[in-house]
Amino acid sequence: MPPDSLRLYGFARKYPAKTMMTTPFEDFLKQHDEESWSATLTTLLRSIHEVDRNATQIWFSFYPLSLFLALEHADDPETLAQRLLLQGKYYLKDQIDSSHTFLYGHRYWPEVKAAVQKYAREFSASFNRTLADQILAVAKHVAGQAKLDEALVIGITAIAFMTIRQVGLAAFEAAPGQVLIDKKHARKSPAEVLRERAVDDSQGFLSFLKTIDKKWTVTYDENDDGGKYRLNHLQDLAWGAAEDRSRNWRELDPRRVEGPIPVECRSASCGTCWVGVLGGAEKLSDVAAREGKKIKEFGYIETVEARPLIRLACQAQAQGAVSIVIPPWNGVFGKYLKSRVNS
């Protein structure tokens, strides 16, 4: 299933683009609302490599078009951001190269970025292909040039298209287009990444007799050997992270008051601790009533899935090793967007 955040209340329909000089490609992208992007992603997911299938959905949940449009068309975006309790880096324009480092396809970002830029500049309104078909065409071109599996660059190509939608082609072209992970991690194969995500911690001799004292590893940055911590069986992700004192977390991100996962309340009241689950979603507890209700109010996801890819870390309890990604921002915007559409 595509990320439900793409379906956020049809917000794009309510706000036509502001008048400005744009390219035909940008005009084409502006014709597509959340529903259209959701359908596009559904089509693409069938072709995206397993290593990036979850990651691509998570990225689109982290950077919803509806929130961008709300801010873009607000009379005073800064005041609206304060009203929606937005904290951290929520604009894609500030992280064109870095927002997708958790995708395997990020390794091919320079090639993808160059190809998308060229395609955008040569785009004509007479092109009669769907958004999904155009993304697939660019990905196929990149794969052919780089001699790699096309499935590895479909997700990152879709991200490039959405990034242009939110930042504009000129800003996209101005970004350096750098790979922001080290060579050691960049050399890993998709199979290696998937294998590491699937491994559970050994519990030692006679582990089958253990019930309470099992411990699991939570990886929060697959591109950092130290980007992980251990927690107890059935301990929630946020509580386990609080015991990680390996770094000065506040210095890295003021939202991180203790541990790598930003927290405030620990009771699903603030929305600070949301995370995406790259691997091991099935090894987390089911979404309980409160988490399901609050995560919709925050605006992060609309779903009835028992174990979705977007979770509140203070509610999700570990039953095995998992790999997560921590978004660089948080807010409370679900009710606002819904009220604007219904008004």
What are these regions (language model features)?
Residues 6, 10-11, 15-198:
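Long, compositionally biased, glycine/small-hydrophobic-enriched stretches that function as flexible linkers
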Residues 187-219, 225, 308-343:
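Short flanking/linker segments adjacent to small metal-binding domains or redox-active Cys/His motifs
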Residues 207-226, 256-269, 273:
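Generic detector of contiguous secondary-structure segments
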Residues 227-259, 280-297:
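Short, charged low-complexity linear segments at domain edges
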Residues 228, 275, 283-285, 324, ...:
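Short acidic, gly/pro-rich beta-turn/loop elements at beta-sheet edges
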Residues 259-283, 304-319:
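Local cysteine-cluster metal-coordination motifs and their immediate loop/turn environment
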Residues 294-308:
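Aromatic- and Lys/Arg-enriched surface recognition patch
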